[in-house]
């Protein structure tokens, strides 16, 4: 006679897939696209042999075509990438430019980020956009007014923000700009493209952020009681990842390579865990500790790319239409704040 074993208790962890979050954002993007006279044209430049970059390019192409956007992938030798970007800057048929990094894996990549025309920079990597982001400036225009042009935020950090909004980590009772007040967040990655900008965005919205890389831990905050308009950075002398993790409600990790794993024992019970690396930074046991686990963010990043493309289109006033709803939803990070 077979023995009957009691049913195992259901997992207390909710796994949220990027595709689920992306669906709602895609609906907004479609609204914005439909009011334009012609589909915006995004051009991607691939100058490396990175399989992850090619996969991202393929996802971008599919998402564009499925949602009424034009997309062209241009594969060029890295020695020709500078001239290709300069030509794209003055091509009136191109509305947005994305470059799949890394190419040179050094300061040359940073230089390339700066030569993309600001009016076509869907990735938000131009100096003006980066300066505005760190200084918590949301507009390109200095004076208030109905025609103010909004600054572009980097795609991957903004994708994480959109996921946090979907997960209701942002407290909508609080005013815009303070909605992460009371949250303590760990960002494991301090790259200039993703990790540091993400820490700055989270801190500018009120969170206490521990930014971690191989050199140690930095704390990003707006000070006690959010007295500062934008974040400040303090070195946490002697701290390592294991010192920061137990304090954090949210853990966001994006370390490249298969060897790095977050120690599940260091996570707070009920933490929200988000992985933005191409590899899995969390072990399968994360579901035993986390309340919410997001294993990847790629599909959200691509939708954010299209939202940025719509915003560039709006900023350039090509079609003289009312700003697309896709980039104007109230209660989000990008909403108008008159303060």
Go through the PLM ranges and name each one.
Residues 91, 244-246, 266-268:
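A short, aliphatic-rich alpha-helical micro-motif
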Residues 110-143, 269-328:
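Rossmann-fold NAD(P)-binding glycine/threonine-rich loop
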Residues 102, 254-257, 277-278:
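Short glycine-/small-residue-rich Rossmann-like dinucleotide-binding loops
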Residues 47-59, 141-262, 272, 288:
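Glycine-rich phosphate/diphosphate-binding loop of Rossmann-like nucleotide-binding domains
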Residues 61-76, 209-213:
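Short beta-strand elements in bilobed, periplasmic/extracellular small-molecule ligand-binding domains
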Residues 2-38:
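Positively charged, low-complexity intrinsically disordered leader regions
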Residues 1-15, 318-339:
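Eukaryotic N-terminal low-complexity, Ser/Thr- and Lys/Arg-rich leader segments
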Residues 70-156, 285-286:
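Phosphate/diphosphate ligand-binding glycine-rich loop within oxidoreductases
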């Amino acid at each position: 006679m077979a023995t009957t074993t009691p049913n195992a208790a259901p997992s207390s962890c909710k796994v949220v897939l990027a595709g689920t979050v992306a669906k709602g954002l895609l609906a907004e993007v479609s609204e914005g696209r439909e009011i334009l006279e012609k589909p915006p044209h995004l051009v991607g430049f691939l100058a490396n042999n990175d399989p992850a970059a090619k996969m991202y390019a393929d996802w971008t192409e599919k998402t564009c075509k499925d949602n009424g956007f034009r997309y062209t992938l241009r594969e060029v030798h890295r020695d020709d990438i500078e001239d290709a970007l300069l030509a794209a800057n003055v091509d009136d048929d191109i509305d947005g430019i994305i470059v799949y990094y890394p190419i040179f894996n050094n300061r040359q990549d940073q230089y390339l980020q700066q030569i993309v025309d600001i009016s076509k920079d869907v990735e938000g990597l131009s100096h003006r956009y980066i300066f505005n982001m760190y200084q918590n400036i949301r507009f390109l225009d200095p004076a208030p007014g109905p025609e103010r042009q909004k600054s572009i935020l980097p795609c991957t950090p903004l994708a994480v923000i959109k996921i946090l909004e979907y997960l209701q980590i942002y407290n909508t009772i609080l005013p815009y700009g303070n909605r992460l007040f009371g949250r303590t967040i760990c960002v494991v990655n301090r790259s200039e493209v993703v990790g540091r900008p993400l820490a700055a965005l989270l801190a500018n919205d009120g969170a206490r952020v521990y930014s971690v890389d191989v050199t140690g831990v930095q704390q990003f905050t707006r000070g006690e009681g959010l007295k500062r308009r934008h974040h400040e950075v303090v070195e946490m002398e002697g701290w390592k990842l294991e010192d920061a993790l137990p304090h954090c409600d949210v853990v966001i990790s994006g370390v490249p390579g298969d060897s790095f794993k977050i120690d599940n024992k260091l996570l707070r019970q009920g933490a929200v865990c988000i992985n933005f690396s191409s590899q899995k930074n969390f072990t399968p046991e994360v579901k035993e500790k986390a309340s919410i686990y997001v294993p990847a963010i790629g599909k959200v990043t691509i939708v954010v790319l299209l939202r940025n493309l719509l915003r560039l289109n709006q900023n350039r006033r090509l079609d003289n239409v009312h700003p697309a709803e896709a980039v104007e939803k109230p209660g989000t990070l990008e909403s108008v704040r008159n303060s």
